[in-house]
Amino acid sequence: MKILNLGSLNIDKVYAVGHFAAAGETIKAERLDLFPGGKGLNQSIAAARAGAEVYHAGAVGRDGGGLSELLRGSGVNVGLLRQLDGESGHAVIQVTPSGQNCIIVFPGTNGMITHGYIDSVLKNFAKGDVLLLQNEISCVDYAMEKGSEMGMRVVVNPSPVTDALLNCPLGLADCFILNETEGMALAGTGSSANADILRALAKRFPAADIVLTVGKDGALYSGRDGTFLSHGIYDTDVKDTTAAGDTFCGYYIACTAAGESPREALEKASAASSIAVSRKGASPSIPEMREVMSFLERNDG
C-alpha cells in the first residue's frame, strides 16, 4: 500500500526565546537555527522512517533543493515533486526553554498547487492507497474529492484550521488525526473536555476514525466501529515540541497502512513522538523505527 502525502515543504527559522513575544513587545532571541520543515515534510519523513512506502507531492521554490534532497535521503519518493518560480514556504518559530512553540507560516510555493497538478499526481495511485492531507497547501478540497472518488483512504490532519478548511468536504475523510484545539474547531463544541471533543467529532464524522492527541494526556481513538482506545505519554526530557504532532501522525499512518491495529499504531506513534520531543529541531528529531522499538522495549518491557 502506497502513502501519498500531498503536503507542505518549508524552511523553518527557529528562535530560542525566554518567552513568546506579546503584542507590541520586542524581545531578544538567544539563538537562531535553520531547519527543513513543514507539516507535509515532517509527516512524510516520519512515515518513511516508520517503514512505509511514501510519495511526497508538492512544490518548492528555487531555494528548496535541500528540502527535496532531505526527503530523498529519508527514503521518501520525490519523483512527483515540482520546482516553481518563487520562494519556498517558510515558518518563523519561537521556542521557549520549556519546549513550547509558537509558529507563523508563509505558504510560498505551497500555495501554488493547482487542480491540474493534483490530477497528474493522483493518476499514479489506486484504490486502497492512502492520501494524506494537511491544510498548508492550496486546493485541499479538490484533493479530498478526487482522492475519495478514486477509493483512496483519505487521512486528514486539519492544521491549521481555517474557514476555507471548514468549508472543505470533510465528510469524505476516512480518518482524522488532530489535536484538542483543532478538534474543538471541527466538532463545533464549546467544551474543552477531551471526552466531549472526541464524542462530538465521532457524531459529526461517523464514517471516520478519529485520533485525538491530547498533550500530556496522550492520545484518544474513536473508531467508526465504535471502538474506543487511549494511550498515555512516555516520560521524557522535553526539549522541543515542534515535530511532536507530525511524528505521531506519520507513524500512526504508516503503522495502520502496514496492517497494524489502531492500538499498536497508537503505541508506536506515542513512543516516536516522545523521542522526538526529547531532541531539538523538527525533521532532525524524528526517530527511525529501530529507535522506537528499542524505546518500547525499555519502557514497556
Q: Where is each model-derived feature located?
A:
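Short, conserved phosphate/pyrophosphate- and ester-handling motifs at nucleotide-, phospho-/glycolipid
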Residues: A47, N179, G245
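Ribokinase/PfkB-type carbohydrate-kinase core domain
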Residues: M1-L9, E69-Q83, I93-L229
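Short glycine/proline- and charge-enriched loop/turn segments
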Residues: A21-A29, I177-N179, L229-G232
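Conserved phosphate-binding/catalytic region of the ribokinase-like
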Residues: I3, D163, N194-G301
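Positively charged, low-complexity intrinsically disordered leader regions
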Residues: M1-A23
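Residues at secondary-structure transition points
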Residues: I27, R31-G38, N42, G86-E87, ...
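Substrate-binding N-lobe of the ribokinase-like
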Residues: I3, A23-H90, R290, S294-D300
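Gly/Ala-rich phosphate-binding loop of Rossmann-like dinucleotide-binding domains
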Residues: A48, S148, A257
